From Swiss-Prot:
One Gene Ontology term, aspect cellular component: plasma membrane
Annotated gene: PRNP
Superkingdom per UniProt: Eukaryota
Biological process (GO), any one: protein homooligomerization
Protein name: Major prion protein
Record: glycosylation sites: N192, N208
Role description: Its primary physiological function is unclear. Has cytoprotective activity against internal or environmental stresses. May play a role in neuronal development and synaptic plasticity. May be required for neuronal myelin sheath maintenance. May play a role in iron uptake and iron homeostasis. Soluble oligomers are toxic to cultured neuroblastoma cells and induce apoptosis (in vitro). Association with GPC1 (via its heparan sulfate chains) targets PRNP to lipid rafts. Also provides Cu(2+) or Zn(2+) for the ascorbate-mediated GPC1 deaminase degradation of its heparan sulfate side chains.
Region of interest called Interaction with GRB2, ERI3 and SYN1, as start-end residue ranges on this chain: 25-241
Organism: Boselaphus tragocamelus
Localisation per UniProt entry: Cell membrane; Golgi apparatus
GO MF, one example: copper ion binding
Positions of region (Disordered): 28-118
Description of its domains: The normal, monomeric form has a mainly alpha-helical structure. The disease-associated, protease-resistant form forms amyloid fibrils containing a cross-beta spine, formed by a steric zipper of superposed beta-strands. Disease mutations may favor intermolecular contacts via short beta strands, and may thereby trigger oligomerization. Contains an N-terminal region composed of octamer repeats. At low copper concentrations, the sidechains of His residues from three or four repeats contribute to the binding of a single copper ion. Alternatively, a copper ion can be bound by interaction with the sidechain and backbone amide nitrogen of a single His residue. The observed copper binding stoichiometry suggests that two repeat regions cooperate to stabilize the binding of a single copper ion. At higher copper concentrations, each octamer can bind one copper ion by interactions with the His sidechain and Gly backbone atoms.
Pfam families: Prion, Prion_bPrPp, Prion_octapep
Positions annotated to bind Cu(2+) 1: H72, G73, G74
Length: 264
């Protein structure tokens, strides 16, 4: 008997709890429905809970409430409200609002100044070094270098060089190192094309070079061509080593396994 009573009370308690949960789910939220005491929109002033923007407390179409098209409210098209297109509100396109489109607010406006565009001349100038020079048969122009300090064996030439070194080139023309069998061929070709181009360009501007200038220019350009060859050779061998490393079977298998783990 005791067990049967206990079971009955447990059943009754379970049914009561289930019914209470069902009622809680069906119970309407306060002030959330249409035409109820609450409002569906935040920031409305009336307790009537209409469906339109912030109003002053009257019903629809009244002169002093907050209804549609009224002179004293917060609705659409009013002169003293917060509706759309008004002169003294916070709506769209107003001169005295806060946050609307094109207003005097500080955030979210569409009339911000556009960002300055990148000057393409600066981009082209930055990409000039190391690029293939048109009209020179595949020669490239190296980066600017400091002109080396060279001693020519006598005071006159040393002084002449120091006084005129600014007239000599600080960049050299060259072809890729893989087109030459050794450093001497690279340097000889580099010196010839660089001195020729610099002489022609400078002569066109009305400045002539003497035999002493040509002699010193060849010595200066030779040193710069040697430096250019060493730089290009090191970069070439590094690229070749990278290709060999990533083409080896163990590395290929490792990369394939990592890709399989990421994709899978």
């Amino acid at each position: 008997m005791v067990k049967s009573h206990i079971g009955s009370w447990i059943l009754v308690l379970f049914v009561a709890m289930w019914s209470d949960v069902g009622l809680c789910k069906k119970r309407p939220k306060p002030g959330g429905g249409w035409n109820t005491g609450g409002s569906r929109y935040p920031g409305q002033g009336s307790p009537g809970g209409n469906r339109y923007p912030p109003q002053g407390g009257g019903s629809w179409g009244q002169p002093h409430g907050g209804g549609w098209g009224q002179p004293h409210g917060g609705s659409w098209g009013q002169p003293h409200g917060g509706g759309w297109g008004q002169p003294h509100g916070g709506g769209w396109g107003q001169p005295h609002g806060g946050g609307g489109w094109g207003q005097g607010g500080t955030h979210g406006q569409w009339n911000k100044p556009s960002k300055p565009k990148t000057n393409m001349k600066h981009v082209a100038g930055a990409a000039a070094a190391g690029a293939v020079v048109g009209g020179l048969g595949g020669y490239m122009l190296g980066s600017a270098m400091n002109r080396p300090l060279i001693h020519f064996g006598n005071d006159y030439e040393d002084r002449y060089y120091r006084e005129n070194m600014h007239r000599y080139p600080n960049q050299v023309y060259y072809r890729p190192v893989d087109q030459y069998s050794n450093q001497n061929n690279f340097v000889r070709d580099c010196v010839n094309i660089t001195v020729k181009e610099h002489t022609v360009t400078t002569t066109t501007k009305g400045e002539n070079f003497t035999e002493t200038d040509i002699k010193m220019m060849e010595r200066v350009v030779e040193q710069m061509c040697i430096t250019q060859y060493q730089t290009e050779s090191q970069a070439y061998y590094q690229r070749g080593a990278s290709v060999v490393l990533f083409s080896s079977p163990p590395v290929v298998l490792l990369i394939s396994f990592l890709i399989f783990l990421i994709v899978g």
